[in-house]
Amino acid sequence: MFKIREKTNADHKVKYIVDVNEKNWNEAYQKKLNAAVKNVKIQGFRKGHVPYQEAIKHIDQIGLFDRAVNQLVQPIYLELVKQEKIKDSETVLEENPEVSVVEIDDKKLALSYSFETIPEVKVGDYLKINGFLSETPVKDEDVQTELVRIFKSAGKLVDKKEGATLEKGDIAFLDFSGEIDNKAFEGGKAKNYELEIGSNSFIPGFEDQMVGMKVGEKRDLNLTFPKDYHEKTYAGKPVLFKVKLNSIKEVQLPEMTVEKLNELMKTQYKNLDEAKEDIKKRMDRNQQEHANQMNTMLLTQFANEDCQFSHIPKSLLDREVNLLYQQFANQMQQIKMSVEDALKIQNQTKEQLYQRLTEQATRAIKLVLVLEEIGDLEKISVSEAEINQEIEERIKEISNNQELPKEQYDAIKNYFVTQKELIESMLTNKKVVDLIIKKNLAR
């Protein structure tokens, strides 16, 4: 079908110039020419009956070449990838090569295929990353606390008995006024403000220093605004709060029955034990998702700040940006809003959106490249059995653990088999992440 005339490797690209076999080019050209001739319209002739030599005078030659070339681009690409073993290459990306015409006329065709190279990655010390979260099992007391929180939403506020002191979990009604450098500041004063002690609604130390107060008592709280406080004017500054406790209330819980719980949660539990088991699973899942999110953020930061890359392939970047844009468009569609309207509300242009998505895509690609490099360094691999197990797990999720008819099961499995490379990559990266976290937590 073709012969490689030249192969070069420069500027992070491997470029092939191929001379297309004259017979293949002639067949493609003649096929498109004959189709074009049939569609030529000239006054005095019926469509499809214009004399051949007269018809070709009225054909757009550039458009004809373009259609004929397009017929050959994909078959030549597939054969080139196979012949040069690009699919198995550890240095060349097979996806989306740049294709251009080098030479063309009705007798010959030469094409250029330019493949991007896989970036060289210099990984930082991935065994000295601080801040990873481990998956801590949810305890029975955690479940009980969550259960109380749910019932608390239907509770009543009642006055605490006379002479009682303020404790964590109580609701305080207080007057307060704050001073920075002996001067009042905006937002630093309120009357009969409702505050749950232990909710950490105020700056660190405020609620802790109120514990033990009695109704009518006044107290000065010497505190410091956090350095990362959202109001930069106050960040890191000492502050004095003068507080007076007006009343102490506590939440009187309703009777903790399964009937009341079902009413509050809109569920159909048979008993509280079943509810606790389900709540525990949900809390475990939420905790795992939170840990995964935080750990991914740490790894992304490491990949972008402590690792070096020779380049970021445009083909990968374009694909990731398009994927992120589609996700954004789908999210807007779910709330019945167009991308254009969303951008107006955010006071953003489409160019600014693409710039943001490009930055986001770059960070994500760098993380994947780093995980792949660490996977190679640590010689991490995934077995065929692990891939098949993952496929079976995904089928179970889709079927909700129900047995599927054989025809439906086979169709779903065949789809996942076509995604084996993607599944293998996902499982490998998960192993890499687990290894990094495990080794860092063990330090």
Curated annotation (Swiss-Prot):
Major site of localization recorded for this protein: cytoplasm
PPIase FKBP-type domain segment(s): 169-254
Annotated EC: 5.2.1.8
BP-aspect Gene Ontology terms: 'de novo' cotranslational protein folding; cell division; chaperone-mediated protein folding; protein transport; protein unfolding
GO molecular function ontology, one term from the record: ribosome binding
Gene Ontology cellular-component terms listed: cytoplasm
Keywords: Cell cycle, Cell division, Chaperone, Cytoplasm, Isomerase, Rotamase
Enzyme class per UniProt: isomerase
Pfam families assigned to the protein according to its UniProt record, in alphabetical order: FKBP_C (PF00254), Trigger_C (PF05698), Trigger_N (PF05697)
Compartments where located: Cytoplasm
Known catalytic reactions: [protein]-peptidylproline (omega=180) = [protein]-peptidylproline (omega=0)
Family: Belongs to the FKBP-type PPIase family. Tig subfamily.
Domain notes: Consists of 3 domains; the N-terminus binds the ribosome, the middle domain has PPIase activity, while the C-terminus has intrinsic chaperone activity on its own.
Name under which the protein is recorded: Trigger factor
Organism, as annotated: Mycoplasmoides gallisepticum (strain R(low / passage 15 / clone 2)) (Mycoplasma gallisepticum)
